[in-house]
């Protein structure tokens, strides 16, 4: 069996973490890979109900995580829940759809996508390639991936998948542990851009804000140094706006509860709005995708 395992450890997570002197593990959910976009929910349903290899792979990989004391969330249970009409109807109003809706709804810290491809050869033999990729839920950062190719057999896709699953490397799980430790130690990086609406007269470079006769850039610079995780952050001028780079914690240091990027960056937005309130301006969130947040300074509504 040919096994190729490669790992990508970017900024973020996967496995043990020390919180208030206690070990904590992330919740992991193994999900089927489907192409994102329109019709994604239908593709999920088709993969789960019409491809026997998919539920097998999800179950077996989940078992491997359980054997290594990871906390896991069963995707098939979540899938059945979504089939309930009441739940599905409420999910239609959710901002996230497709796989992201499952991951967000289950509150998984990490999700592992599994893609299974079957290739047929002359003579009737076939093999499967199994691709696994682990991602952090909020940012979507790729943390680890593995590619496993089964030997060639005269066998079904389900049987070949079972053979391939025997080749999961221990290094994959070790990498998850180390990456998660690194994430908890260093925090998650977020990039916040702050721009001025075209109908707003605020001069970001020259107008003083707050009570200390400082520019917004200087005020935010001090705030970031005080509030970013371990003081790790900076403010840069970029074009007609500001770029704020800062680290946010994975877990609240006092309660041990997960910290969402939205809640942490919301603190900065409210701080900036407070500085601009007396001038007749407010700061609102224009867009957000993972660790990228766009804020906009606008005229306050009367």
Task: Describe the predicted segments one by one.
Residues 1-21:
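Bacterial Sec-dependent N-terminal signal peptides
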Residues 110-154, 290-302:
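Amphipathic beta-strand/beta-sheet edge segments enriched in Tyr/Trp
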Residues 20, 102-105, 122-124:
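Short, charge-rich binding segments
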Residues 115-120, 231-237, 284-285:
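Short amphipathic beta-strand and strand-loop transition segments with alternating hydrophobic
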Residues 19-29, 38, 142-232, 267, ...:
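C-terminal/domain-edge helix-coil "capping" segments
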Residues 31-33:
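Short hydrophobic segments within beta-strands
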């Amino acid at each position: 069996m040919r096994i190729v395992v490669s790992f990508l450890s970017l900024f973020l997570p996967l496995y043990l973490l020390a919180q208030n002197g206690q070990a904590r593990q992330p919740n992991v959910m193994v999900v089927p890979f489907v192409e994102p976009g329109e019709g994604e929910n239908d593709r999920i349903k088709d993969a789960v109900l019409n491809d026997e290899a998919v539920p097998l792979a999800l179950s077996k990989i989940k078992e491997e995580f359980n054997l290594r004391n990871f906390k896991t969330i069963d995707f098939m249970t979540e899938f059945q829940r979504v089939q309930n009409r009441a739940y599905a109807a409420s999910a239609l109003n959710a901002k996230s759809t497709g796989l992201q809706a499952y991951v967000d709804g289950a509150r998984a810290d990490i999700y592992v996508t599994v893609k299974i491809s079957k290739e047929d050869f002359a003579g009737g033999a076939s093999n499967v390639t199994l691709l696994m990729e682990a991602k952090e839920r909020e940012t979507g950062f790729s943390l680890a991936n593995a590619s496993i190719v089964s030997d060639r057999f005269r066998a079904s896709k389900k049987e070949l998948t079972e053979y391939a699953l025997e080749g999961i490397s221990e290094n994959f799980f070790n990498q998850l542990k180390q990456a998660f430790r690194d994430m908890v130690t260093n925090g998650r990086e977020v990039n916040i851009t702050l721009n001025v609406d075209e109908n707003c007269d605020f001069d970001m470079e020259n107008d003083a804000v707050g009570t200390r006769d400082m520019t917004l850039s200087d005020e935010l610079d001090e705030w970031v140094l005080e509030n970013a995780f371990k003081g790790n952050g900076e403010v840069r001028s970029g074009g007609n706006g500001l770029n704020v780079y800062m680290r946010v914690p994975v877990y609240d240091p006092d309660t041990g509860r997960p910290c969402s990027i939205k809640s942490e960056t919301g603190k900065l937005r409210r701080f900036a709005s407070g500085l601009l309130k007396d001038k007749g301006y407010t700061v609102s969130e224009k867009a957000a995708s993972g660790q990228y947040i766009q804020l906009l300074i606008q005229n306050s509504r009367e």
